[in-house]
Structures are given as C-alpha cells and as structure tokens.
C-alpha cells in the first residue's frame, strides 16, 4: 500500500517482530525464505513467505564473496540486514553468530541488529572465529560463558518485541545431554525461542522439545527430517531445510555467464526473468510513482 506521497507503507520493525511472535504462538510450522539481499527480501514478501532467514554464511557470500569464516564484520552484517528490512515486511531472523566476541560484544551485536530492523537474532556458543592452532574441528565455549552471552543478549534489547534465540551445536559436537542442558539454561536466561541447527535424528529434536517450554526454530537437516507436519508436533514453529535457493541462483549466474563467454548472445539466454518480475523485484512501480510526482516538472 502507498501513502499519499507514493511511498509504500512498511509495517516497521516492532510490527514485524510481533508478527513473528504470533507465528511462534501458532500450532503449525512455517517455512522460512532464504534472504540475503534486498531483491530476495522483496521476492519473499511477494511470494507470501511469513518469515525469512539470513544465515551468517549467506551474508558473507553476498557482501564479501567470502566463506563463512567470520571475516564479515558486525557493521557489514547490520548494513545488509537494514538493506533487506527497508524494502520488505517479512520478519527476518538474523544469524548473529557468536555475537562477534564476548558477552559485551554480544550486547553490541543485538543493539546494532535491533536498529537494523531484525525481527529475531540468534546467538550461538560456538568458539569463533577459528583460533590459531586448532585442527579445524568446531568447538564450543564453556557452559557458563554460553549462558552469559545469552543473558547479555536478552538484556541488550532496545525493543522488548525483538526476539532473542539461543543456539548451540552441542548435539552434534558434545552429545544430546549437553545440548539439552545448554538449551534449558538458555531458556532460564530468558530467550524467546531455541534455534536448533542441523539436527540429524528425530530423537534429537524430540529430546530438546521435551526439555524446554519455549518454541523451537530449525535450519539445516537431512531430508528425513524435512516434514513440517512432524516438526509442528514438536513445537518447531519455523524452519528452513537449507539455503539451496542461493545455490540455484549462483549456478544460474555461472551457467549464463559461461554461455555468454562461449559466444551465446545474451539476448538469447534461457531462463530470463520477465520484465514484470524484474520490475517487481526492484521496486520499479514505487520509483515510477515518485518520478511522476517529483521529477516531471511542469510537463
């Protein structure tokens, strides 16, 4: 909807956050869109997604063309989040990684992502970035530090509607007992929901769902677990099987560039977006209205 000046009326961060909270109160499980830039954010809204997920890997790919090794800065992440939230009403769950440092850094991370318009921020207890001399195997910070990080994240919210999600990979790295203990401690620290990355078995999801009362969100799982009906029974309210849509887009770009490099005329490339889709994805109708109102002069 446009206002009298031709500006599309966005709901604003608080309303988006309340929409996400409403999703967490429902009985079903929604699929989150992969969002990594303003175009994907607009498409997610136009296609009717109720929530989106910006993974740390996606942000690093889109902003730096770099792998997910914590070389992206907090400033760069917050800027990319804002670019997405300023054009779309889809509530955005943002991967805050380890919070870019200790508990004080976590507070700064939550503050900046709050200002950028994130609907929810995940904070994890993985030891990041990879320390010197490590074998490359992921490791977790201590139990006490993990809880302190989450407590700091909850305290740092400027808007009480911003959701803080506690995340740990303990089920994969240390076993389900440690994962359950950490998630229960995160719940006691005040998180709004648990974010479960990469579960491999239903038994893991069942154990965590039985141990906590707050809702669950999930991302990355084998095909056997990609069953929204089952996930809904375990109080998983939003999920993503992975970021394969980014992979598909990358392959399409690679293949089309390869065809042009080999002599195909770009006009003849297969699979091109229609003019209408391109204009919808880039906000052309809105800009056309502004142009008519403010650049036409006396014509």
Swiss-Prot record:
Molecular-function GO terms, alphabetical: magnesium ion binding; methylisocitrate lyase activity; oxaloacetate decarboxylase activity
Binding-site residues for substrate, renumbered to this chain: 57, 167, 243
Cofactor(s) for this UniProt protein: Mg(2+)
Catalytic activity: oxaloacetate + H(+) = pyruvate + CO2
GO biological process, one term: pyruvate biosynthetic process
UniProt-annotated binding residues for Mg(2+): 95
Presence of the UniProt keyword Cytoplasm in the record: no
Cofactor: record remark: Binds 1 Mg(2+) ion per subunit.
Top-level taxonomic group: Bacteria
Tagged with keyword Nucleotidyltransferase: no
Pfam families hit by this protein: PEP_mutase
Enzyme class: lyase
Enzyme Commission number(s) of this protein: 4.1.1.112
Assigned keywords, A-Z: Decarboxylase, Lyase, Magnesium, Metal-binding
Complex formation: Homotetramer; dimer of dimers.
Family: Belongs to the isocitrate lyase/PEP mutase superfamily. Oxaloacetate decarboxylase family.
Primary role: Catalyzes the decarboxylation of oxaloacetate into pyruvate. Seems to play a role in maintaining cellular concentrations of bicarbonate and pyruvate.
Protein name: Oxaloacetate decarboxylase
Organism: Paraburkholderia xenovorans (strain LB400)
